[in-house]
Amino acid sequence: MDSKMIAHNMSLTPTLAQWKKLRLKPKHTFVVGVLARPTDDISEETLRKTNVYKDNWFDKLAINHLSKSVQAATGISNNKSGFDSLVEAATVASQKFNTTQQQGIILDALDRAFPKPILSVIRRVMPPSKLAREYFAVFTTIFFAWLLGPSEVRESEINGRREKNIVHIKKCRFLEETNCVGMCINLCKMPSQLFIKDSFGMPVNMVPNFDDMSCEMIFGQEPPASTDDPALKQPCYKLCKAKKNHATQCLS
């Protein structure tokens, strides 16, 4: 696979409306992976070791809400509960739909999960600024631990000033449960970047580290073009559940 295979008539930074059109009338498969190095370099111990989560009532409510939103977007329901239900809904999306459709499905699910009036209010009262970037970082660490796992706010430099605008996710819960690079890219990174930018006017670059399953969300930073994004040049894991159980080529 080669990233040059991306359709030339497809924008590298499409709007949310354009993604919905692509989802409804897909014409091309969006190539999001390039074989860059052997998967033997990835520690199997890292892949096999999983954290144990004790979800509270809020976590369970949020997980169920997002899972139901994904199921509604795919039109395929499941009878599992808790985080297993969310992983199953995401796995079905990765098996039944091409990569362009997968990203569109998650955008649809996020539209269902978060009321538009609330998003509009947040966008109006918090235009892009140092305060907004730091607010989004803190908010993410507090209210999305159920999805991302433990995280912390870190500093970076923007226009010569230090800001606490980075969320460092120590080991992504979604990635460790799926063991799938393709699901990380198509069902999390790409649609989340677009949704946050389109909903709040806030650019964010999500930088996963597939060696240790950590990730950084850098608020205020535009993500690189698809052809230049290192995350899209990572082969999937040998222990990828989608590939192992369903012979799925999860990156194409």
From Swiss-Prot:
Tissue distribution: Highly expressed in roots. Expressed at low levels in leaves and stems.
Gene Ontology CC annotations of this record: chloroplast
Protein name as annotated: Beta-carotene isomerase D27, chloroplastic
Chemical reaction(s) catalysed: all-trans-beta-carotene = 9-cis-beta-carotene
Cofactor(s) recorded in Swiss-Prot or TrEMBL: Fe cation
Presequence range in chain numbering: 1-43
Main location: plastid
Keywords, sorted A to Z: Chloroplast, Iron, Isomerase, Metal-binding, Plastid, Transit peptide
A Pfam family reported for this protein in Swiss-Prot or TrEMBL: D27-like_C
UniProt keyword Acetylation present: no
EC number: 5.2.1.14
UniProt GO MF annotations: beta-carotene isomerase activity; iron ion binding
Job of this protein: Involved in strigolactones biosynthesis by catalyzing the isomerization of the C9-C10 double bond in all-trans-beta-carotene leading to 9-cis-beta-carotene and providing the substrate for CCD7. Strigolactones are hormones that inhibit tillering and shoot branching through the MAX-dependent pathway, contribute to the regulation of shoot architectural response to phosphate-limiting conditions and function as rhizosphere signals that stimulate hyphal branching of arbuscular mycorrhizal fungi and trigger seed germination of root parasitic weeds.
Induction: Induced by phosphate deprivation. Induced by Rhizobium lipo-chitooligosaccharide elicitors.
Miscellaneous information on this protein: Roots of plants silencing D27 exhibit a strong reduction in strigolactone synthesis.
Coiled-coil zones: none
Protein species of origin: Medicago truncatula (Barrel medic)
Family matches, as InterPro entries: D27-like (IPR038938), D27-like_C (IPR025114)
Subcellular location: Plastid, Chloroplast
